[in-house]
Amino acid sequence: MEYFDMRKMSVNLWRNAAGETREICTFPPAKRDFYWRASIASIAANGEFSLFPGMERIVTLLEGGEMLLESADRFNHTLKPLQPFAFTADQVVKAKLTAGQMSMDFNIMTRLDVCKAKVRIAERTFTTFGSRGGVVFVINGAWQLGDKLLTTDQGVCWFDGRHTLRLLQPQGKLLFSEINWLAGHSPDQVQ
């Protein structure tokens, strides 16, 4: 497992100067040609998402005003807080901020022919489903994972197994992204 704190992660500025990215993890680790990747992006201006042919992207708005996502003839979608939205990353998608507010979102990308991600918001203790990878990001509250305490803007990335996250306060929210491998594929084939 890899623990992270968003406030301590390195920041990569976008070439178009419209935002920045904090990479959480990739699988396989440290590979440019990843099967899946999780990141957090801060968007400061209207602009286009980077293209990633053969990938699916799931975007979840964490902070800021709603964001309008437009893709030519394919869709117009208003991204609302904590409501994941999936689209293929090989199409031009423009992001327009509402009311000029900066926004922050969680992104998970998966190779369409290898694995699939599912993103959910949890508000109570839960156990992961024995997936072969995933990411948890704490939106608020205090959560226990084994002997590790996770609080706002912290999280963990794992590559296999079942894990129980216990909510330690009356209220809390976390984003949970689970990776499931398609038939004929396994993370064991990669490592």
UniProtKB/Swiss-Prot annotation:
It comes from the Bacteria. Gene3D superfamilies: Jelly Rolls. InterPro entries: RmlC-like_jellyroll, RmlC_Cupin_sf, Uncharacterised_HutD/Ves, Uncharacterised_Ves. Pfam families: HutD. Belongs to the Ves family. This is Protein Ves. It comes from Shigella flexneri.
